[in-house]
Amino acid sequence: MTTLDDKLLGEKLQYYYSSSEEEDSDHEDKDRGRGALAGSSMPADADLAGEGISVNTGPKGVINDWRRFKQLETEQREEQCREMERLIKKLSLSCRSHLDEEEEQRKQKDLQEKISGKMTLKDLAVMNEDQDDEEFLQQYRKQRMEEMRQQLYQGPQFKQVFEIPSGEGFLDMIDKEQRSTLIMVHIYEDGIPGTEAMNGCMLCLAAEYPAVKFCRVRSSVIGASSRFTRNALPALLIYKGGELIGNFVRVTDQLGEDFFAVDLEAFLQEFGLLPEKEVLLRTSVRNSATCHSEDSDLEID
């Protein structure tokens, strides 16, 4: 329970004004206001705008803006370099393709000129030493072989042995045949050693050399003497252009009485009296047993 003194003192305290209290209040208000300003202020390095833009104009902001600018500049330069490299590569490829095409056309033109016969033997010898021209040499040889084959087979094809029935037929066969045709005439008589072997060889070679005309005639038909028949048969006469270019009498002296087609072929090739063949000898030439079989008959006209 309060006394009268307390009440009196209390009322005085309520209405009592102290200068120290006012100063304390002012200090508190200032501190409170300073704290509010500090809380509302933004950091020095804060960015409030988009990428590459800073509202901070302080030293750190300027440095960051410069770094970002240099980074963008470097990226742009690298992209330009890559684009330039792609363009250069594309242009180089297109130029190379065009140049390669022109070079190939030039090579083909040179090749055709050389193959057409504009190359001398000296040029051919030089190219044989140059491995880089191997492709040309292969094509050249191939075309030359084809040309020789056409020259060999462009005339008539015979492929059999012709029997000459008379002396007049013998002369006509020599004089009226094409001048480029090679004619081989076997003069024979039955019972002469080596006659049967020669007949079989002629049959085989006629199939192997269709451009060569193989014939046979009895010595009695052309009026040969008995001495010639006994001592010179079997004989082989070779004509070309109406002239006698080969004359082999008593062939058995060189080949023996039992010889084969391959033996006669090698003998004639040794003297250059058979054209070169494009292909190897077929089995029918090498297999003399087939050519000399008793069941096979000569194709005689």
Swiss-Prot record:
Keyword Chaperone assigned: yes
Matching PANTHER family: PHOSDUCIN-LIKE PROTEIN
Main location: other
Coiled coil feature spans: none
Domain Phosducin as annotated: residue spans: 37-299
Region annotated Thioredoxin fold, chain positions: 158-301
Function as written in the Swiss-Prot or TrEMBL entry: Functions as a co-chaperone for CCT in the assembly of heterotrimeric G protein complexes, facilitates the assembly of both Gbeta-Ggamma and RGS-Gbeta5 heterodimers. Also acts as a positive regulator of hedgehog signaling and regulates ciliary function.
Lineage start: Eukaryota, Metazoa, Chordata, Craniata, Vertebrata
UniProt keyword list: Acetylation, Cell projection, Chaperone, Cilium biogenesis/degradation, Phosphoprotein, Sensory transduction, Vision
Protein's gene: PDCL
Species, as recorded: Bos taurus (Bovine)
Family the entry assigns: Belongs to the phosducin family.
Sites of Phosphoserine modification: S20, S25, S226, S293, S296
Protein name: Phosducin-like protein
Domain of life (superkingdom): Eukaryota
SUPFAM superfamilies cross-referenced by the UniProt entry: Thioredoxin-like
